[in-house]
Each structure stands twice: as C-alpha cells, then as structure tokens.
Amino acid sequence: MTKRAEAKYKIDRRMGQNIWGRPKSPVNRREYGPGQHGQRRKGKLSDFGVQLRAKQKLKGYYANISERQFHAIYVEATRLKGDSGENLIGLLERRLDAVVYRAKFVSTMFAARQFINHGHIKVNGKRVNIPSYKVRVGDVIEVKEASKQLAFVLEASQLAERDVPDYIEVDHNKMTAKFARIPALSDVPFAVQMEPHLIVEFYSR
C-alpha cells in the first residue's frame, strides 16, 4: 500500500467513518481508530472536541489540507455574504483538486492533487498545476490530450460508487468538465455528514 493510501485510510480510522464512501475503507471491517490503543472505548467528547473533530474530518476529506490553508479558506468564507459555513463548503468545492475528483477524472481526492501537480489538467485551455487553484463559474476543466488514455483515468470515469454532482457538467468522452455553479452544502455528495457550522464555532471561540 502506498504512503498516500495509508494516510487516506488512517484518516478514516481516526474518524471512525468511511468519509469518502470507499469500498476498501478499513472502517468497513472495524470501527475503532488506528494504533494499538484504537480499540479502547472513547468517552463523550466536549463541545470543543466535537468542533475539532468536525474540522479534522472536513480537512481530511479534502486530502488533508494544511491548517494554514484551511484557516485561510475559513477567513475568506467569513468575509463573503451569507452563511459562513455554506461559504466554506462552496470555497472548498471550487478548489481545482475537488473539481477534478468530482468530475471522476481520478478515483480519490489524493490522486486529484497528484494528477494536477504532474501537469495533466488544463483550465480554459491553459495548463494549471496548482491543486488549490480557485475555479470560477463557467470555467472548463479538461484532461490534457496525452493523458486522456491513462488507464487509471479511464477506470475512474467508470466508478459506480459515486456520481458526478449536478453543479459540474461532465463529458467523459472528451474528458472535459464545466463548473456550472457554486454548490450549497446540501448539493455536495459527501458520504458522511459534514458540519461546517461546528467549524465556524471552533474558529469563533
């Protein structure tokens, strides 16, 4: 198993949830955390603990975004009009790695980050190799021509375990995707419940 896969599954075990809905997640077989003490019964979390856990889960979902990056996104969310929790989700879903994952060009959020880093993605005809690049409504994302026949790309597009959300318009024959609109929390196909309002409470302490 690769280090990336180990990190991904470690997040699942720590959260005690299959946060991406993956069939091979270890929590499908056991419901305790990683390490030798993972089987110990955990006590009830404090309000702070619940808020921290919500933050760790959302950060982990988006390929373990660094705290610095995540907090910067939160700050931006608070400066936008409307609900800060909803804004936070909208900004996270505008990340290029999130769009590439949602479009089913790759099978995992971690793979999306690597795929972009290696120069396989174009936005509006220009190569972009920054996973955190902020996609705008109307932007067209495409897999570079030379990369369209990569086996793992073709395999990802056929994954039955998740569907492409309706705020992304995808043509898998051409390997292109259009970011149609900024989603609300209820639009995003999370495999588990995400609670951005708890993250707002965490940072507001």
UniProtKB/Swiss-Prot annotation:
Residues 94-157 form the S4 RNA-binding domain. May be methylated on an undetermined residue. It holds the Pfam family S4. SMART domains: Ribosomal_S4 (SM01390), S4 (SM00363). The keyword RNA-binding applies. One of its GO terms (molecular function) is rRNA binding. GO terms for biological process: ribosomal small subunit biogenesis; translation. Residues 19-45 are annotated as: Disordered. GO terms for cellular component: small ribosomal subunit. One of the primary rRNA binding proteins, it binds directly to 16S rRNA where it nucleates assembly of the body of the 30S subunit. With S5 and S12 plays an important role in translational accuracy. Part of the 30S ribosomal subunit. Contacts protein S5. The interaction surface between S4 and S5 is involved in control of translational fidelity. This is Small ribosomal subunit protein uS4. The lineage of its organism: Bacteria, Pseudomonadati, Pseudomonadota, Alphaproteobacteria, Hyphomicrobiales.
